């Protein structure tokens, strides 16, 4: 009877998934799933970064990082097995449009809550709070030791990362060079087109670790504060609440801390634990 009961629940779950595809709401779910045949069942598409070591990184055909761990936990809590999770690379410039056109069901990509306009997407979380940091070539670490040394220099930022205006406020006569991705900023830094990269400290640590050889170094005191959220399509407030509940469970059962420890082992980064884990507030705030 136990096996039959479990089978019945699984069949019911597939019916719910199918009803979602057909646009019905009998199962009271907000998530959009696609069916790739009965063998695989419903899948969930999650937009992630592929170029942020320690957070979202694609290497050898496998995704890894803290954001990936968070995405997997949330998807599992929503009822999706590992084989039903499909990761798709998104860029800051495509995150919102990928949600709007249904390419992905959610985005877990170092997505700061202040990166979007009101009503553009639904947000859940936050799940991590970070500071900003400066990343320089090691041979410049003696002359660029912090934000006070940025005057007259060129600082690279990636779209969707540290806002350009906040970098301009750090020092007089600083030139901000905005690139599409962090690897582009890293290349600019290595060939001398930029003197520093301004990025979230988690991202800066990942870039330095991945480059290896001591070529890059995080310098100075961290500054500013940003909180990472999970984004879903505008209007999916029920799904945002479900994700909030999953994130809270991750923090409560120790899985969040395990993911943090794994990130430390990978890139040597530990977030400011006076700010983490952050309070889950975003889906509730969107109702106000």
Task: Mark where each language-model region is.
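Extracytoplasmic small-molecule ligand-binding "clamshell" domains
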Residues: 33-107
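Acidic, polar ligand-binding/catalytic clefts
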Residues: 85-149
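Extended ligand-binding regions for polar small-molecule ligands
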Residues: 28, 68-78, 138-140, 161, ...
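Periplasmic-binding protein-like
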Residues: 50, 128-136, 205-247, 266-288
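Bilobed "Venus flytrap"/periplasmic-binding protein-like clamshell domains
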Residues: 48-54, 63-78, 112, 131-186, ...
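C-terminal motif of bacterial Sec signal peptides marking the signal peptidase cleavage site
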Residues: 22-26
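Short helix-initiation/N-cap motifs at beta->coil->alpha
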Residues: 85-97, 142, 177-187, 191, ...
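A ligand-binding cleft/hinge motif common to bilobed small-molecule-binding domains
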Residues: 94, 110-119, 166-169, 190-191, ...
């Amino acid at each position: 009877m136990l096996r039959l009961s479990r089978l019945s629940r699984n069949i019911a779950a597939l019916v719910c998934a199918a009803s979602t595809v057909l646009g019905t709401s009998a199962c009271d779910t907000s998530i959009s799933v696609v069916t790739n045949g009965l063998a695989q069942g419903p899948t969930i598409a999650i937009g992630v970064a592929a170029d942020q070591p320690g957070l979202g990184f694609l290497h050898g055909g496998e995704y890894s990082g803290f954001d990936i761990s968070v995405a997997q936990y949330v998807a599992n809590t929503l009822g999706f097995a590992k084989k039903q999770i499909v990761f798709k690379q998104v860029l800051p410039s495509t995150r919102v449009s990928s949600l709007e056109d249904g390419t992905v069901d959610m985005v877990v990509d170092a997505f700061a809550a202040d990166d979007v306009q009101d009503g553009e997407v639904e947000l859940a979380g936050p799940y991590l709070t970070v500071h900003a940091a400066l990343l320089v070539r090691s041979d410049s670490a003696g002359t660029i030791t912090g934000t006070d040394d940025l005057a007259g220099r060129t600082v690279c930022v990636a779209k969707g990362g540290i806002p350009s205006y906040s970098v301009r406020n750090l020092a007089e006569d600083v030139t901000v060079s905005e690139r599409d991705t962090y690897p582009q900023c890293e290349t600019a830094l290595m060939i001398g087109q930029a003197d520093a990269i301004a990025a979230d400290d988690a991202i800066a640590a990942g870039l330095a670790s991945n480059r290896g050889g001591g070529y890059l170094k995080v310098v100075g005191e961290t500054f500013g504060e940003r909180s990472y959220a999970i984004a879903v399509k505008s209007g999916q407030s029920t799904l945002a609440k479900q994700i909030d509940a999953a994130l809270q469970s991750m923090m409560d059962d120790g899985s969040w801390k395990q993911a943090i420890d794994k990130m430390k082992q990978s890139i040597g980064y530990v977030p400011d634990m006076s700010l983490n884990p952050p309070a889950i507030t975003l889906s509730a705030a969107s109702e106000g």
